[in-house]
Amino acid sequence: MNFETIIGLEVHVELNTNSKIFSPSSAHFGQEANANTNVIDWSFPGVLPVINKGVIDAGIKAALALNMDIHKKMHFDRKNYFYPDNPKAYQISQFDEPIGFNGWIDITLEDGTSKKIRIERAHLEEDAGKNTHGTDGYSYVDLNRQGVPLIEIVSEADMRSPEEAYAYLTALKEIIQYTGISDVKMEEGSMRVDANISLRPYGQKEFGTKTELKNLNSFSNVRKGLEFEVERQAKVLRSGGVIRQETRRYDEASKGTILMRVKEGAADYRYFPEPDLPLYEIDDVWIEEMRHELPQFPAQRRATYINDLGLSSYDANQLTATKAMSDFFEKAVALGGDAKQVSNWLQGEVAQYLNAEGKAIQEISLTPANLVEMIGIIADGTISSKIAKKVFVHLAKNGGSAREYVEKAGLVQISDPDVLIPIIHRVFEEQEAAVVDFKSGKRNADKAFTGFLMKATKGQANPQVAQQLLAQELQKLLD
């Protein structure tokens, strides 16, 4: 029997506001334990939450970016549960009226086909703290994360393969990152994914019993965990077994999923409206203000790069992977840079440098104007492509004018025959053995002189001019 895979994803995105959702404490990552807390985060008696307007702004932007309807009368609810990292014994979230609902995004699969994935809802809530279990037998609570604003984005169960789930997460991350509401860094916990997966026989309308997957700390692990579950559940069903409603975690060591707990039924969180927060009215003026702040998104940019600038689909995808890189590219082209040349540099030397340094493009000193100027002096013969790599590293570290640096550092390409011919003759004198090989007709002996000449000029000889002059002077040796 063959089975159809049914997948839905729940994605928590940490919003990059300066302060928390209901308290003035800093929301920044990486501080000493409990440094970013106050009496609201610790839930002291009598303290009251105050909404951070920037969180609602971010929620509106997310809803618009995900093609969602917006609840114009929005409220918060209490989700009741007890856990040590939750001192109030409830979480302030949204239940029946989330800020966004009925959305969708398009995804592109590896074969180039596209599919629309519906999004059920996007709701605002506060994050919980973090428990740490020490080797001394004690457990410790860090409330730095308590109250950090989140938006949870819940898809419909529209994905039919792990590949589609991976494509959905990739597209969702791009869109959220472009809005500027989050840096969506999974390694820092600002994007977290839970997956729900079930199988059903083809043709059956009812969903099968779902399994929830946790501990998915990368898109790759989401895909691997789902692929494992497809095989595991199919094997159970084909052998006549029954799938239990479980929560499982992905284990990187075994490349499989491990049972965490069996769910007997849906949890009852006893939601009710948060009495300490008012109803918030989101009018059309507010919505349009947020819409005006949104950028052009990756799909539209890719279409422009392909249709108007003549780039390949691959190049367009690479350039739009982050908003910072896409913005850099567009500014460089607007300054007169050739789109293909700019693209080649950004995907080549620039990308290699950023990876080696562990930095984003906005964190180095290279500017679009610097890059365009450097490409220009390559084109006019001032420097060679080889020297340009050295110039680029200088610009990445120090900025400034490419032409001024080249002139100051003595890196201008040598194209004058009156300068190059004497150097060629000196090379002949120094490389007597190579000259003998050449005269005797030894195969490829002439090619060695190119390397000798480039070494003698410290790489500054114009390659095209050098080749012509070398051929000319070598021929004279045979005459």
Swiss-Prot record:
This is Aspartyl/glutamyl-tRNA(Asn/Gln) amidotransferase subunit B. The keyword Nucleotide-binding applies. Heterotrimer of A, B and C subunits. It is an enzyme of class 6 (ligase). The keyword Secreted does not apply. Coiled coil: none annotated. Disulfide bonds: none annotated. Belongs to the GatB/GatE family. GatB subfamily. It catalyses: L-glutamyl-tRNA(Gln) + L-glutamine + ATP + H2O = L-glutaminyl-tRNA(Gln) + L-glutamate + ADP + phosphate + H(+); L-aspartyl-tRNA(Asn) + L-glutamine + ATP + H2O = L-asparaginyl-tRNA(Asn) + L-glutamate + ADP + phosphate + 2 H(+). Its EC number is 6.3.5.-. SUPFAM superfamilies: GatB/YqeY motif, Glutamine synthetase/guanido kinase. GO terms for biological process: glutaminyl-tRNAGln biosynthesis via transamidation; translation. Allows the formation of correctly charged Asn-tRNA(Asn) or Gln-tRNA(Gln) through the transamidation of misacylated Asp-tRNA(Asn) or Glu-tRNA(Gln) in organisms which lack either or both of asparaginyl-tRNA or glutaminyl-tRNA synthetases. The reaction takes place in the presence of glutamine and ATP through an activated phospho-Asp-tRNA(Asn) or phospho-Glu-tRNA(Gln). Keywords: ATP-binding, Ligase, Nucleotide-binding, Protein biosynthesis. NCBIfam families: gatB, PRK05477.1-1, PRK05477.1-2, PRK05477.1-4. HAMAP family: GatB. The lineage of its organism: Bacteria, Bacillati, Bacillota, Bacilli, Lactobacillales. It holds the Pfam family GatB_N. GO terms for molecular function: asparaginyl-tRNA synthase (glutamine-hydrolyzing) activity; ATP binding; glutaminyl-tRNA synthase (glutamine-hydrolyzing) activity.
